[in-house]
Amino acid sequence: MSFDFVKIFETIDLHKNDLDVDNFMTTVINHCHQMQPNKNWELFKALDYTTEVKSLATHVVNILEKEASSFSEQGFWFGLSDNGYLYFAVSDRYIADEDNLDWIFEAQTHYPEEGAFDSKILRNIEDLADETELDNYAEYPLFLAYGLKLAQASINHYKTAYPERKIGYSIGYDSGDIITGGWV
């Protein structure tokens, strides 16, 4: 069986509402293993995803308190690069359309200077992918899956801090492949 990136993307989207971060990541890793059998997938399962998600959940609110936008935030974009760099940006509008990021580019947008997440897990995924030669078979899906969980935790924390605000979010690679979190 060859590695089907479309299928793994669909798996991530299908299971995105799993509240147990470690269980979600194990589900994604198991699907990856089915398509690209390799004993080293177990190394990715050993990472402590939940602890870091909890520790980074406050990042968005903390940064926006220091680097406030000049408008009321409505849309949140969590962008990923191919090397596991995850950052966030906010805009004054949001469109919950899986194939459309115009809302982030055609609206007032704020890219906080300190918007990048300092994630050891994302760096560990990249290092393990390189060391085990799983490379993009691990990086693409696990960056996206874990980035999604960081985004969800950040949005949940934001909603706790600002329950009256209606916000939406999406996450994906700057080069494409978007998962829409929707309105919260």
Show which residues each predicted segment covers.
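Amphipathic, interaction-prone secondary-structure segments
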Residues: T58-N100, G182-V184
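Contiguous, amphipathic alpha-helical segments that mediate oligomerization or scaffolding
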Residues: Q36-E67
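Intrinsically disordered, low-complexity regulatory segments enriched in Ser/Thr/Pro
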Residues: L86-D135, I178-V184
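Acidic, proline/glycine-rich low-complexity IDRs
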Residues: M1-Q34, N38-F44, S69, R123-V184
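Charged, low-complexity, helix/coiled-coil-prone segments
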Residues: M1-F5, Y49, Y85
